[in-house]
């Protein structure tokens, strides 16, 4: 057997680039040449209305999911510090072995109370929550019907479910906001007519669509789901802290949940059947996601969900911070109202400046510029002017629909918004 020295191996490798290396270099070159290469901006302090960015100094932040301004709230930070001191840095296990701590129990009760559900269960991310939901709860013969504009975590979770469990069917309907009820009803009719689809029908939607800022027509969807004996699943990651008087979500906005602390009625006609959501946006905990649903659903997730069985629990420090953030949101409805006032002012001022901003009551204010390279160039120029806004283009949004996504926070003031508009006028 021939023996190779390290220098001979290194020399051999320098003349034999892998297929991956060649392919990756080609893709990255195309992204750079087209102006679509994304640069990571290094933030050198806490998240707030203004952030310190390496190379740019202090900039107004209009691209954060920190909708209620809780990411650096003193009580939220202190709760995390106490959690770190009391429970340590890591859980060192999955939940069913020795990774379930009292902060998990407290947080999950708080989430269920907020959402108006029987139960909830937490994960290290909302992506993981979605990944646990469909492959665990769906069985062959089921049909999953998904909005075309749903978040990538839902899309990939549905793909995973249909791959793992052969015989799970999927369908996509035109966006509920743009196309109304016709496309969804057609998908429901097709599912009912499919002789191989004899199981449960699941209708899946974002509550607030992350790129459009629009909201799903949940009352109409609930009515259709009842007609076809379908379950309604809502990912409300951009609705928590934003929609409804208390910030409980899009279902509260539509009056589809009882007052806080009213006992949950499993299967009631005005309910959303299952939620997925995040703790890393308005709810200020820094990371983590959850499923909120009936106890039978969360019990099945605990018993059979692969992300539950084979992935570590949410760190206790994050659970403590998130619990405090929800507590603050529910006790301070004026914080949610301030966000709504800021959103209304921002949309009015941006529109008055001549920009095409999509209309919505949510904190996401997309300014349509159509071309991806243009959106990225505008984002760069805004940063030079001291305003942090991100440009989004293909493949995050369809070709020709590139945009600047302005995101408003309760931490912003009218003066901050005026500075944003002044910078936009200079583009």
Question: What are the functions of these language-model segments?
Answer:
Residues 337-344, 351-386, 396, 400-401, ...:
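Conserved PLP-binding catalytic core of the aspartate aminotransferase-like
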Residues 78-125:
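Conserved N-terminal alpha-helix of the aminotransferase class I/II PLP-enzyme fold
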Residues 66, 168-234:
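Active-site phosphate-binding strand-loop segment of PLP-dependent enzymes
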Residues 246, 250-300:
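Active-site PLP attachment segment
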Residues 133-152:
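Conserved PLP-anchoring active-site segment centered on the Schiff-base-forming lysine
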Residues 1-4, 8-13, 74, 78-82, ...:
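PLP-dependent enzyme catalytic core of the Aspartate aminotransferase-like
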Residues 22-89, 230:
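N-terminal "arm"/small-domain region of PLP-dependent enzymes with the aminotransferase-like
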Residues 283-350, 355-358:
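PLP-dependent aminotransferase class I/II
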């Amino acid at each position: 057997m021939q023996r190779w020295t390290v220098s001979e191996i290194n020399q051999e490798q320098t003349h034999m680039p892998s297929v991956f290396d060649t392919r990756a270099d080609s893709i990255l070159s195309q992204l750079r040449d087209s102006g679509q290469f994304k640069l990571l901006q290094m933030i050198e302090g806490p998240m707030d209305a203004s952030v310190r960015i390496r190379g740019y100094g202090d900039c107004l932040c209009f691209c954060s999911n920190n909708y209620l301004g809780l990411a650096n709230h003193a009580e939220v930070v202190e709760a995390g510090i106490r959690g770190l001191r009391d429970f340590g840095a890591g859980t060192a296990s999955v939940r069913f072995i020795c990774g379930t701590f009292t902060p998990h129990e407290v947080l999950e009760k708080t989430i269920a109370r907020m959402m108006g559900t029987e139960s909830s269960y937490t994960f290290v991310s909302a992506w993981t929550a979605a990944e646990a939901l469909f492959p665990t709860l769906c069985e062959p013969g089921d049909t999953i019907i998904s909005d075309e504009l749903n978040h990538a975590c839902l899309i990939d979770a549905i793909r995973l479910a249909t791959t793992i469990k052969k015989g799970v069917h999927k369908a996509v309907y035109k966006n509920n906001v743009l196309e109304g009820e016709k496309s969804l009803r057609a998908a429901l009719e097709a599912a009912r007519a499919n002789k191989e689809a004899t199981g449960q029908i699941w209708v899946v939607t974002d509550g607030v669509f992350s790129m459009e800022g629009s909201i799903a027509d949940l009352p109409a969807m609930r009515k259709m789901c009842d007609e076809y004996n379908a379950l309604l699943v809502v990912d409300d990651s951009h609705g928590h802290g934003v929609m409804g008087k208390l910030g409980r979500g899009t279902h509260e906005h539509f009056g589809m949940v009882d007052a806080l602390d009213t006992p949950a009625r499993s299967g009631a006609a005005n309910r959303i059947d299952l939620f997925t959501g995040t703790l890393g946006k308005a709810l200020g905990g820094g990371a983590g996601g959850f499923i909120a649903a009936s106890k039978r659903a969360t019990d099945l997730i605990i018993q059979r969900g692969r992300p539950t069985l084979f992935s570590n629990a949410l760190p206790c420090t994050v659970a403590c911070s998130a619990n405090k953030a929800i507590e603050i949101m529910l006790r301070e409805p004026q914080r949610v109202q301030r966000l709504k006032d800021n959103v209304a002012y921002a949309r009015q001022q941006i529109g008055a400046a001549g920009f095409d901003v999509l209309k919505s009551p949510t904190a996401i204010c997309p300014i349509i510029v159509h071309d991806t390279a243009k959106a990225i160039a505008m984002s760069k120029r805004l940063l030079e002017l001291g305003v942090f806004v991100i440009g989004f283009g293909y493949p995050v949004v369809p070709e020709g629909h590139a945009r600047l996504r302005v995101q408003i926070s309760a931490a912003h003031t009218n003066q901050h918004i005026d500075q944003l508009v002044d910078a936009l006028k200079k583009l």
